[in-house]
Amino acid sequence: MTRSLKIGSLFLSGVFLTTALTACSGGQTGPATLTVDLSDRHQTMEGFGASSAWWSQEIGGWTDIGQSGKEVREEIMDLLYSEEGLGMNIYRYNLGAGTGTGEKPGVFTDSWRSAQSFIDDNGNIDYSLDANAVWCMNRAVALGADKVFFFSNSAPDTMTITGMPHSEEQRKKVTNLAPENYQAFADYALDAVEHFRAQGIPVIAISPINEPQWTWQGGQEGCHYEPDEMVALYKVFYQEMLSRGMTDDVELDMFESGQFGGSKFKKWFKALAEDETLGPVLHTLSGHSYNSSFADKEKTAKWLKKNYPDLKIRCTEWTEMTSGRDLGMDSAVIMADMICNDLKILDAISWTYWLAVSQYDWRDGLLYVDPSEPKPQTYTLTKRYYGYGNFTRFVKEGAVRVGTQMDRDKELNSIAFEQDGKLTMILVNSSAENERQVSFNIANANYQTMTTWLTDETHDLEQTAQTAYSAQGSVTLPPQSIMTVVLE
């Protein structure tokens, strides 16, 4: 059950202990076996997070006092970043492109899709701007976020060809940033990185190009780049970072691809990867999972591992892209299935959700807020929020993914990690009708206890069992459920 609160309880619902999982009503198919190979070690995780785009510039100003005695903005950030909440450790700060303090030039679907830059009405740098979003970033860091990524959808509108942070209808597949402004954009972005690092913000990467494959002709911030234009801009960024001595501390993130796979991936990727200057210094590819099928990702992963075996991958954006708000398990199990697949197929070292907070009639935010104006400072938690917690609260930085194999089954998915002597398994049952029993086959396991945490129709990331572990241990997954199993 979701909650609509002024400021709700921070803690993730009531916790109760039982000696076994309670069987659920409904259909049941045959049992499945999850085999875990502790010696089959894959990527080491950086963590999980969310993007600040489109919500932090408003939520950071929500200073009403709620039932807990805290400001609403504090409660929301606690839910996302405190250890009693989701405990995320990655924050993607959107380096906005709208200059000045008044209405921003451009054609936007709504006010949330225009983000403020640090350029004031007189063209001067002012780091007191974008104050609400900066407050959210500072709060996330105070709560434990130790990795901040700066990303730009567009250069500031004062630098663009159209004078807006997007192109125009008649300018299809044409960049909006002239070459003579590449240096100005690099200076602006890197100045911001240096400023906030000096303030104690752990900015570890800068991503100046976001989904360059698309045309970005209005509706939100964005900039198209052809592959050669992208390479030219990246060379300016890299040379400027070298001259500032930043390359040891701040990573120049390879472009954030709008998809994993297809010609629109390879063409842009190869332009950077095969460049004599950039290829040797770009070590991590960020990509978005919106427009990529399971088969696309498998094909891309195989190609990357063969040709670029040292490349690391971060999955930096995903949401379901389906209209209609959903508070329940339908979208939660789709999200959990996507996370499992991205981490297993792509060996992604991190996974970052797109909209942490949404005002839209889409299956997107982890939390929803009211779209009416002026907005009441209330929010609603979703099952996606709790389901994301099945990953974020248990799989921490330094966890190593280990090999898993499950009987071929379209309804079930799984993933496992080892860290500090613990084995954490996340199981997903996407069937709306059938509960599923899953037994474990773990060679050379020396665990004493098994604890389970469940998100389903009636549980919000609740501890549902704590028992002695046996080699023939098993769990029962209710229909449409996400379960975290921790062996110690």
Task: Cite the ranges covered by each PLM segment.
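Bacterial N-terminal signal peptides that target proteins for export
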Residues: 1-11
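C-terminal motif of bacterial Sec signal peptides marking the signal peptidase cleavage site
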Residues: 22-23
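N-terminal catalytic cores of secreted or lumenal carbohydrate-active enzymes
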Residues: 31-204, 224-231, 235, 239
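Structural recognition of the beta-strand scaffold that forms the well-ordered cores
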Residues: 44-52, 88-95, 147-151, 204-208, ...
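Active-site neighborhood of glycoside hydrolase catalytic domains
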Residues: 184-191, 195-202, 212-318
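Aromatic/acidic polysaccharide-binding cleft in carbohydrate-active enzymes
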Residues: 312-393, 402-410
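Carbohydrate-binding surface patches
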Residues: 407-446, 480
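C-terminal beta-strand-rich structural cap/linker in extracellular carbohydrate-active enzymes
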Residues: 466-488
